[in-house]
Amino acid sequence: MMGLTEGVFLILSGTQFTLGILVNCFIELVNGSSWFKTKRMSLSDFIITTLALLRIILLCIILTDSFLIEFSPNTHDSGIIMQIIDVSWTFTNHLSIWLATCLGVLYCLKIASFSHPTFLWLKWRVSRVMVWMLLGALLLSCGSTASLINEFKLYSVFRGIEATRNVTEHFRKKRSEYYLIHVLGTLWYLPPLIVSLASYSLLIFSLGRHTRQMLQNGTSSRDPTTEAHKRAIRIILSFFFLFLLYFLAFLIASFGNFLPKTKMAKMIGEVMTMFYPAGHSFILILGNSKLKQTFVVMLRCESGHLKPGSKGPIFS
C-alpha cells in the first residue's frame, strides 16, 4: 500500500511535470507558429525552441524514472532499463545545459559592449561562433554519454558482488572505483558553468560601464540598452542558480543507492530535478518579448479581459 511519503512524491512529480510540459510546449507552439508564418527564425529563437523540446524529453525521462522508483524498483535497478534511462537522460541533459549556455553567450555577444579586439572579432562573427558552439555542444554531449560505458561496467560488477552479500576488500575497492568514476563524470558540467559565469561577468562589467556613461551624460539610466543588459543578466543568473540546485539534486539522486534511506534520497532528488527544466523555461518566457506578449494575451483571454483574436494594447 502506498504511504504518505510516496503519495506526496507522486503528486509533486506529476505537478512539476505538468507545469514543465505546459511551459515548454507553449514555447514550442509560439515559436513554431511564428516560423510557419514567416519561414524565418532568429538564432535565439532557434536555441530556445530546441531547448524547450529537449526539456520536454528530459521531463518525460525524469517522470518515467520517478514512476519506476515508486512502482517497480527492481525493474529500475535492472541493468538494461537503468542503462537506457541513464544514456537518454545524460545526452538530453548535457545538450540542454549547453544550449542554455550558448543562449547566454549569444546574449552577451549581442548586448555587451567592449572595445577589445577579441571580443569585437567574436561579436562581428556571432552567427558563425554560435554554429561552432552548437556543434561543440553536440560533440561534448556525445562524449559525456560515451563516458558512461566504464561506469556501467563497474556498476554491474559492483551490484554482482553486492548481491552475494560478500563484503570483501574486492567489494570495497570496486565501490570506491565506482564512486571515483561517478564523481569524475560530474566534471562534464564544469565547462558550461564556467562559460555561463564568464558571460554573466562580462554583462555585469558592460552594464556598469554603460550606466556610468549615462550618468556622466546626464541621461536616464533606464534606456533600452540598460534594460537589455538587465534582462540578459537575469536569464543567465537564473540559469546559474537553478543549475546549481539541479546539480545538487542530481548528486542526491545519483548517490541515493549509497545513502542510508535509499528510496527517500532518490525521491527527493527526482522531485528537485524537475524544478530546473520548468523554472528556467518560464524565466525565458518572461525575458523574451514575443513569448511574454503572447503569454500576457493568453492570460487576458483566459481571465475574460480580452476577446480571443484581438491584439490588445501590448501589440499597439
Swiss-Prot record:
Its main location: membrane. The lineage of its organism: Eukaryota, Metazoa, Chordata, Craniata, Vertebrata. Belongs to the G-protein coupled receptor T2R family. Glycans are attached at residue 166. The chain crosses the membrane at residues 7-27, 43-63, 95-115, 129-149, 187-207, 235-255, 267-287. Several bitter taste receptors are expressed in a single taste receptor cell. Pfam families: TAS2R. Residues 1-6, 64-94, 150-186, 256-266 are extracellular. This is Taste receptor type 2 member 3. One of its GO terms (biological process) is detection of chemical stimulus involved in sensory perception of bitter taste. It is found in: Membrane.
